[in-house]
Amino acid sequence: MKNKNLSMPSLKEKLLQETVEHIDITRFDARPIIDAMDHMSFTSRDLARATQIFNRMLQDEQCSIILSLAGSTSAGGCMKLYADLVKYNMVDAIVATGASIVDMDFFEALGFRHYQGSPAVEDRQLRDLYIDRIYDTYIDEEDLQRCDHTIYEIANSLEPRPYSSREFIHHMGAYLAQGKAKKEESLVQLAYEHDVPIFCPAFTDSSAGFGLVLHQVKNPDRHLTIDSIRDFRELTDIKIKAGTTGLLMIGGGVPKNFVQDTVVCAEVIGKTVDMHKYAIQITVADVRDGACSSSTLKEACSWGKVDTAYEQMVYAEATSGLPLLASDAYHRGYWKDRSPRQYANLFKSESK
């Protein structure tokens, strides 16, 4: 007689049953909601104005749009949203945390998933089960370590020399495009295919860091390195080339400061560029702590980073407001008349 317990799922399998499903901005039209919010107050009206500014960026033929991405919204259900911004030519460059790009997007491109969980859980038990928690979202640590090892393999395949994070992520996109992707249309692969550069100024603060440390330990005399100074120079080169720029910033942190500072960096190296003409930030950070993440866009003007004519702070948890902004922009369709910038081509000879 068969042991019935053999077919029963383990506790880990029970906890990792419900996957996070990523929102599809093409399947619902948020225009009526945004139009209604424009006649409301508080955060609703702020979000409506931010959406209007984003649509203005898309209509401005001279404007290049840079997405700044921090936090865990990719794991929380916005992963396809970011990929669609690239697919439909609504962003021209991306500055993100390493976790957003590697631990979340590249991770799912390899066939792994994020799972719906609960913050009301015994975290010591999760640790024993090798389950990582991001508030109410779970990740299988064993899968994450497989992602780390993939970064290690990519690093081993490359010439041992300094790389910008943009260049290394380009090779990650090539890896996926060469038939290694288990999931279609990831952000990393679409950015590779559409020549949209992705920068992670704190690249090693992610799964990439574990893979690259392993690469250096195993190859002490012949290994690659990530050159964050080159990241800054390359992104500043894009700002100089672009002229007029608009920022869509989700969260704050290193990506926000990094992309804003391109104006200052250009000035330091003797180039005259305009401040970022348009800027939107969606955040829950409190301005009173004096941190970069919470600093207002008006404050950024005092540093010479952001103009104040078209700026909007939206104080909201991004997964609740960003899908409305992005859906509205998709359905208004101004992206259809934009020329792709393909800024990755500025560095094509360096990425071979």
Swiss-Prot record:
One of its GO terms (molecular function) is deoxyhypusine synthase activity. Gene3D superfamilies: Deoxyhypusine synthase. Belongs to the deoxyhypusine synthase family. SUPFAM superfamilies: DHS-like NAD/FAD-binding domain. Keywords: Transferase. Its EC number is 2.5.-.-. The keyword Protein biosynthesis does not apply. Pfam families: DS. GO terms for cellular component: cytoplasm. This is Deoxyhypusine synthase-like protein. The keyword Cell cycle does not apply. It comes from Coxiella burnetii (strain RSA 493 / Nine Mile phase I). One of its GO terms (biological process) is spermidine metabolic process.
